[in-house]
Regions:
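Transmembrane alpha-helical interface segments in multi-pass membrane proteins
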Residues: 301-303, 310-354
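Peri-membrane helix termini and adjoining interfacial loops of integral membrane proteins
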Residues: 2-10, 130-132, 261-263, 353-367
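Hydrophobic alpha-helical transmembrane segments of multi-pass inner-membrane transport and secretion
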Residues: 21-48, 275-310, 333-342, 390-394
Length: 415
């Protein structure tokens, strides 16, 4: 059997004397590792959950990549672009693209007897993936929107419903103003949704693509553009580059120029803010590893000083400094392991509690979510545990050299 491992195991197993000086030090070291690991697990889980939740909401409103008229992407006004079957086929054939859906935007005003509100009507058809709307459905059933028949039904947010005092099934007039005059439509509220992403909830309604195209006075094969969903968000830039090479700067049969833009380019403030969360995580990880390292160093030094006589006896019977150092490093591994076990139980328990109960609430007007989102990632969990163990042991190598300074004659005479 490995001698340092055997000695460390005996020392750790027999460390039950309540009068020993090193017992509080060991407990503090275990607590330091446990708290540090628990905080790291919870912090990473919250940041992952928060980033992915907000990102998915933004993507839900605009997909990963938009292909549209060059002028539309440069200004707030909507310009049409040909989006017929041939172009859709080209977009769907691009590697990395999972789904393609058409859309048309028309600015308008929703008006009730007591109030009115300017909104953006987003026309969608049968090819539109409504999973995002279903996930945030408050009331109603999503109509089967079409590009060939007008439904006269509208999907509105809870924020719009509250401001205009609308409920499911209510009739509401919409007015559209352009160079030809004012157009009016009467819609029935078919669905109410709520994402808590206020800048979208306050202005976004969904209608059928047919009505949106007609209100814009466009041709039947024209739209505001197409939204592309990619297979892997981490490879968004690669897929976007393929879209640029395939589509950008090409001209449709009406003389309009195609262009494209990623969701990150359309929402730079939100994604820059989410990127800052990564910096916060690294700061927290650094602080927690420092706390765990300092408590372990202090504990190891106290343990070595407390067992000076034992070190002297081991040296007297021929044990080398490296053997004794390894003994105390193995002892530290046992201590760190116990702390990590407790830390994992605490951290994973808190993550599970928040995931299943939503115990910690947030102000959705500020944070875009009503509860703190958490997300468990197995790979990150493994990396955090391995990194905590390796770093904690690594920082103890230098303090363990204190063993070589202990003189066996002096230590045994003292005993």
């Amino acid at each position: 059997m490995n001698l340092p491992f055997f000695l460390a195991k005996r020392i750790y197993a027999n460390n039950t004397d309540k009068t020993r000086v090193d017992r509080p030090a060991i407990r503090i070291a275990i607590a330091g590792v446990a708290v540090g690991l628990a905080v790291m697990l919870v912090s990473v889980s919250v940041v992952f959950g928060f980033k992915h939740t907000i990102r998915n909401k933004v993507v839900g409103f605009g997909s990963h990549i938009q292909v549209a008229n060059f002028m539309t992407l440069q200004a707030s006004e909507q310009y049409p672009i040909q989006m017929g079957d041939s172009m859709l086929k080209v977009l769907r054939a691009i590697p990395g693209v999972r789904h393609v859906q058409r859309f048309a935007i028309k600015q308008g005003i929703l008006k009730t007897n007591s109030d009115f509100l300017g909104v953006a009507f987003k026309g969608i058809a049968a090819d539109y993936d409504t999973t995002f709307i279903h996930q945030h459905l408050v009331a109603g059933a999503i109509p089967h929107f079409s590009d060939s028949v007008g439904k006269q039904q509208v999907v509105i947010s809870q924020a719009i419903a509250d401001q205009l005092n609308l409920k499911l099934g209510d009739k509401v007039f919409a007015y559209f103003i352009d160079n030809t005059g004012v157009k009016a439509r009467r819609f029935s509220v078919a669905v109410i949704y709520q994402t808590n992403l206020s800048q979208y909830d306050k202005v976004t309604c969904f209608i059928d693509l047919y009505t949106a195209v007609k209100l814009n006075a466009w041709e039947t094969d024209q739209a505001s553009g197409a939204e592309l969903t990619v297979n892997d968000f981490d490879r968004l830039d690669d897929t976007a580059a393929r879209v640029v090479n395939k589509v950008n700067r090409t001209i449709d049969r009406y003389g309009e120029t195609y262009s494209s833009q990623t969701i990150q380019e359309m929402n730079p403030q939100i994604f820059s803010w989410l990127d800052l969360l990564d910096l916060n995580v690294w700061i927290i990880l650094g602080l927690m590893l420092s706390v765990a390292g300092v408590t372990m160093i202090s504990g190891l030094l106290i343990i070595i000083l407390e067992r000076t006589a034992m070190i002297g006896i081991l040296k007297a019977v021929g044990a080398r400094n490296v053997t004794i150092r390894r003994t105390f490093l193995w002892f530290a591994v046992f201590t760190i392991g116990k702390g990590m076990l407790i830390g994992n139980l605490i951290g994973m328990g808190l993550i599970a509690l928040q995931h299943y109960t939503g115990l910690v609430k947030l102000n959705p007007a500020t944070y875009y979510v009503s509860t703190v989102p958490v997300e468990f990632n197995l790979l990150v969990w493994l990396l955090l545990n391995v990194a905590t163990l390796l770093i904690s042991v690594f920082v103890l190598i230098a303090p363990s050299y204190l063993v070589s300074k202990i003189n066996p004659a002096t230590s045994m005479r003292y005993e």
